[in-house]
Amino acid sequence: MSQQGLEALLRPKSIAVIGASMKPHRAGYLMMRNLLAGGFNGPVLPVTPAWKAVLGVMAWPDIASLPFTPDLAILCTNASRNLALLDALGAKGCKTCIILSAPTSQHEELLACARHYKMRLLGPNSLGLLAPWQGLNASFSPVPIKQGKLAFISQSAAVSNTILDWAQQREMGFSYFIALGDSLDIDVDELLDYLARDSKTSAILLYLEQLSDARRFVSAARSASRNKPILVIKSGRSPAAQRLLNTSAGMDPAWDAAIQRAGLLRVQDTHELFSAVETLSHMRPLRGDRLMIISNGAAPAALALDELWSRNGKLATLSEETCLQLRQALPAHIDIANPLDLCDDASSEHYVKTLDILLASQDFDALMVIHSPSAAAPGTESAHALIETIKRHPRGKFVTLLTNWCGEFSSQEARRLFSEAGLPTYRTPEGTITAFMHMVEYRRNQKQLRETPALPSNLTSNTAEAHNLLQRAIAEGAASLDTHEVQPILHAYGLHTLPTWIASDSAEAVHIAEQIGYPVALKLRSPDIPHKSEVQGVMLYLRTASEVQQAANAIFDRVKMAWPQARIHGLLVQSMANRAGAQELRVVVEHDPVFGPLIMLGEGGVEWRPEEQAVVALPPLNMNLARYLVIQGIKQRKIRARSALRPLDIVGLSQLLVQVSNLIVDCPEIQRLDIHPLLASASEFTALDVTLDIAPFDGDNESRLAVRPYPHQLEEWVEMKNGDRCLFRPILPEDEPQLRQFIAQVTKEDLYYRYFSEINEFTHEDLANMTQIDYDREMAFVAVRRMDNAEEILGVTRAISDPDNVDAEFAVLVRSDLKGLGLGRRLMEKLIAYTRDHGLKRLNGITMPNNRGMVALARKLGFQVDIQLEEGIVGLTLNLAKCDES
């Protein structure tokens, strides 16, 4: 998340080209040519002993002779000289360097050298970067690009060149175009942090092949996507493609889960990528998912409709008033419906009349206009008419409009006109629908991330007991636990299993069956045979002692014949579960090499191929995220919405997934968990067969997760001056209703001191941003008092750190009727201790001069107080290092 050096890379004031050349096709020549042609208005310093000047610019023989230190250096020499040149640049004080080429064998030394001098590196093997707003073309690309508001970050030079060529033909602009190369130092997460605050960037497109730090990526992407749409294309979905790219990219469903969790949108191929670029370049915010389609032919509209249905899209329904107006304005033979087919003899006037009526209505959220080549309404003429209608209509600048002028030659000019007018345009009906559904899915992802999670009922967790059981099993040398052994661990987290007993032989199996009652099931116990079905190691519905004895002996005999070396640890004996009307599910937790633990949900009783048969989520899960996973599974037909007799209990299954998530987050010893089958019967969920793989773990528990979980260890009970006890804890997404109630009990004056303006009401989005925080980037502590099985918030303090984790902005607010109890001071002390322990250097805040209570508290806590009467503010700064010393 560090931003150190990025300003010098992306907005350099001076550039040195190391290895500049006058020989065409040399890297140093191409880089100099592009820098000078791009219009960069700072000094460009060619460095080469071979030439006195390069392209008319005075050259310098070596780095030491440069008249001043450049912000950015670009290495265009033979890779064998990289280390020596980087050392010389570091000694000169250069802040950033682009390395165009370097073998893998140099990577460690290059990175060590850069860190020694606190220099940032882009690359190696980077195409470079383009920043049109700075007139900067520090790349090999000969293609000039226009200024725009779309930023593109790519891990592939080939894809970068393709996009550049495509964008030039369409005169599409960019704010930044950055080719990362091998991402030895500067990586995608840091660039996302930078671009999220860049005023010239309104949308971001990523091409990714791999990640070096999934946690940092998810954190940065989630933060950036709250304000700007981000689309991702990820290659290497198959193992074969991963081998070709020489990456260890992990499971593809894990990427889907991470992208959704961060609020991004994934596109699947280059065709969708180009549509996405068009959409992001001209997109207006989407209000909903209702689409209205206008066409001058039934067939193109039908193609669009088929694609919309295949993607679970939604058509708008026209009101009676709108239908009446359309009937009066259009010829009688036109059927008023959606899609609205104006027929192949439709003139430009028909399009204009239709648009005027629809734009005045509130019946749709997006409008798709299709035009097929027609003598009655030439493409260019119709495009002009549409553009003028949009410009003059009062709602024109607010409507989400997508245009599809079919054909190639006859529609080129029309598409150019749409691009100039800032209207997205596509070549095919299907491509237009794809672009629309991108917008819908992005909006859904963002909305889903901001939903307030429900508080799950009756969740239990006994972390200490689970840890003790796992540590005892590991100490005894166990690597895998079966259903009987894992029962107490699951019970510690409120997960129900079918009662299970162990029998060492057939006689003991009969004895247990007599005790628990028939019918029963027998299951083989062997650490050497993971799949019992391979030896028919599971026998069901055994109704008599004779059947149990025969089945037990048969299992033992089959193992001796098929697996003579296998260790046999007896049999599991279970009562037969009541499967009438029940649904069999499967819940698996696996460790992904990139994203860590994954929670997978699918149907039971099938061969397990997660890429095809499961939906995947990253822990930790709350009720919202778990419910979204279940609904996603139903929509994608990975699980059924009902059994033969009853519907699936979505809330109950969501709660079970939250319990599994809590278990995985709390217990890093768990390497893999397989609950199969999980029997869903009405509101009851019972694990019939469970396998748990375990291993010692002595690292940082949280570091293995792609999303930082709720930090339980920061909870603390505090006694106020009046003797009441309250809990100081990190804020939770579920706190939104209590936070709204808390704010209602704060006076307008106190709110004005806190927010520097009069606020009548906080929206759901405001409160979601306050409660659904990324604990890696900010912290908010709430003081809560528990009364009658409910919690009320008494005070809140918050700190938001910068990406470099140096400074943090703080704020504190206490309920107005509870002042004088020391609550504000205790909350601030809690926040100061946290930020200091988190490695931050300074804590900064502002208040008003007449907020005397806050100013006095700040002085008592050691803050430097800077009263700026002319500005009407008081600056508060605490040096955390000095605070630590004191």
Swiss-Prot record:
Similarity section: In the N-terminal section; belongs to the acetate CoA ligase alpha subunit family.
One Pfam family from the record: Succ_CoA_lig
Gene: pat
Keyword ATP-binding: yes
Ranges where the ATP-grasp domain occurs: 487-523
SMART domains with a match to the protein in the record: CoA_binding (SM00881)
Residues annotated as binding ATP: 513-524
Signal peptide stretch: none
Lineage: Bacteria, Pseudomonadati, Pseudomonadota, Gammaproteobacteria, Enterobacterales
InterPro entries: Acyl_CoA_acyltransferase (IPR016181), ATP-grasp (IPR011761), ATP_grasp_subdomain_1 (IPR013815), CoA-bd (IPR003781), GNAT_dom (IPR000182), NAD(P)-bd_dom_sf (IPR036291), Succ_CoA_lig_flav_dom (IPR032875), Succinyl-CoA_synth-like (IPR016102)
Entry function: Acetylates and inactivates the acetyl-CoA synthase (Acs). Can also acetylate other central metabolic enzymes in response to environmental changes.
Highest rank taxon of the organism: Bacteria
Residue ranges occupied by any N-acetyltransferase domain in the UniProt entry: 726-881
Regulation of its function: Exhibits positive cooperativity. It may be the result of acetyl-CoA binding to two distinct sites, or the result of subunit interactions.
Protein species of origin: Salmonella typhimurium (strain LT2 / SGSC1412 / ATCC 700720)
Top EC class of this enzyme: transferase
Protein's UniProt name: Peptidyl-lysine N-acetyltransferase Pat
Keyword entries, A-Z: Acyltransferase, ATP-binding, Nucleotide-binding, Transferase
Keyword Zinc: no
Catalyzed reaction equations: L-lysyl-[protein] + acetyl-CoA = N(6)-acetyl-L-lysyl-[protein] + CoA + H(+)
EC code(s) of this entry: 2.3.1.-
